[in-house]
Design a protein with these regions (language model features):
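Structural signature of hydrophobic alpha-helical transmembrane segments
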Residues: 64-76, 124-138, 161, 179-192, ...
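Hydrophobic core segments of alpha-helical transmembrane domains in multi-pass membrane transport
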Residues: 22-35, 75-81, 111-116, 193-198, ...
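Hydrophobic transmembrane alpha-helices of secondary-active transporters
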Residues: 60, 64-89, 295-314, 329, ...
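Functional cores that coordinate and move charged inorganic groups
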Residues: 144-250
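Predominantly late transmembrane helices and immediately cytosolic-facing juxtamembrane segments
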Residues: 1-15, 49, 209-217, 221, ...
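Entry/N-cap segments of selected transmembrane alpha helices
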Residues: 86-113, 183-192, 313-337, 361, ...
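C-terminal ends of transmembrane helices
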Residues: 4-10, 77-93, 141-152, 195-206, ...
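Transmembrane alpha-helix boundary signature
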Residues: 32-45, 58-64, 78-95, 110-130, ...
Length: 383
């Protein structure tokens, strides 16, 4: 019975659609909880939790902010690892292919903001244009997981890159436009840590503990600076080394493994493990380790803590009379689509970049429709 349960659980974890299922379930639960549970939803997620280390530092945030600023760093770290892998070894290693999602992402930031401003120019809400500029990477990845292998791998790579560039741009907007105070001293520390990480990756250090410590330090520094702390995940992910296995390292790992089989003791087992770790980049190992945690825990918990929007007849009636609502709808639904799809066509027609051979404009058209899902960064801006 226990063996059967373990087998079923392992299959659930490996299934790409499991994360999307949990994400949808968490969103529904959040909506029901917020609308049927009185004020318990708001009270629970606004409960404060603090960590103190003597007089050195203290962090005091609500549970919702711990999730948005802390747990979501793991999500951005994972997608940045995937982007780095695609740029170095995957579908986007040629600049002409990588340039299309980058150009599309920039246009996807500008066009929605202009449309939103056109609806709200001259009102007190005109400065809220940042709400419509972001694509929700978590939800887009969840939707892509539902389709699984029915979508080209190249489309996923393009959309992931587009979403990451989009999110980084949106987070920079938060840092420069919507952040009241930025402390530059911690940012100097960020530059120092990033420079050290660059040197470490050049040396192909394989121990994950080094990068975990660096990531925690980056997170604290970004948090202290006033810049959104999830950027730490992006910086760390882009600085982790990725490389194809070298034949000599693979042969060495194989030799050590055979030696362990002949002499199964702790010393030979440890040597075999180290040999295998050295042959695989830290980027790929981190992706493998973090994917189930992020997809099955982090993203659903994020949705549960943020998707609880109170819906009533009165709020809907007021919303649809407001130019703010129509600016958001037009910016996200129309602006993101026009910006991303239009820029992709222009970039390819002007030969700024090119699409992968198996991708057609119909794929980009479908993918562009997904970019109008704006949730994560919009909530960060609202905060």
């Amino acid at each position: 019975m226990l063996t059967k349960f373990k087998s079923s659980f392992s299959a659930f974890v490996r299934n790409e659609t499991s994360g999307a299922t949990l994400l949808l379930a968490a969103t529904i639960v959040a909506l029901l909880w917020a609308n049927l549970g009185g004020h318990s939803y708001e009270h629970f997620w606004h409960t404060h939790f603090s960590i103190h280390l003597g007089d050195i530092f203290s962090v005091d945030m609500s549970l919702q902010h711990w999730i948005n600023d802390g747990l979501m760093m793991m999500f951005f770290f994972l997608v940045s690892l995937e982007v780095k892998h695609d740029f170095v070894m995957g579908e986007l290693r040629e600049w002409r292919r990588a340039s299309v999602p980058v150009v599309a992402a920039v246009a996807g930031l500008i066009v929605p903001a202009l449309i939103f401003y056109a609806f709200n120019a001259g009102t007190d809400d005109a400065d809220a244009w940042g709400v419509v500029i972001s694509t929700d990477t978590a939800f887009v990845m969840g939707i892509l997981a539902v389709f699984g292998n029915r979508l080209p791998v190249q489309l996923r790579a393009l959309l992931v890159t587009l979403a990451v560039v989009d999110d980084v741009g949106s987070l920079l907007v938060i840092a420069t436009v919507y952040t009241e105070r930025i402390s530059f001293v911690p940012l100097i520390g960020v530059v120092v840590i990033a420079a050290l990480l660059f040197l470490v990756q050049r040396a192909r250090v394989y121990r994950s503990s080094v990068y975990i410590a660096a990531g925690a330090t980056l997170w604290l520094l970004f948090l202290a600076s006033g810049v959104h702390a999830t950027i730490a995940g992006v910086v760390l992910g882009l600085l982790l080394p990725v490389f194809p296995p070298e034949r000599s390292e693979v042969l060495r790992a194989e030799e050590l493994t055979h030696h362990f089989r002949r002499t199964p003791v702790a010393s030979t087992g440890s040597a075999a493990v180290i040999g295998i770790l050295r042959s695989v980049s830290i980027n790929e190992r981190m992706q493998l380790a973090l994917a189930p945690i992020v997809n099955l825990i982090v993203v659903p918990v994020f949705a549960l803590s943020n998707a609880g929007v109170i819906i009533s007849g009165e709020t809907l009636q007021h919303a649809f009379k407001s130019p703010l609502t129509w600016g958001i709808i037009a910016g996200l639904v129309g602006g993101k689509y026009l910006g991303v799809f239009g820029a992709s066509i222009i970039a390819t027609k002007l030969r700024i970049g090119e699409l992968a051979q198996c991708l057609a404009y119909r794929h980009i058209n479908a993918g562009s429709m997904l970019t109008g899902i704006g949730f994560t960064i919009s909530l960060f801006i609202i905060d």
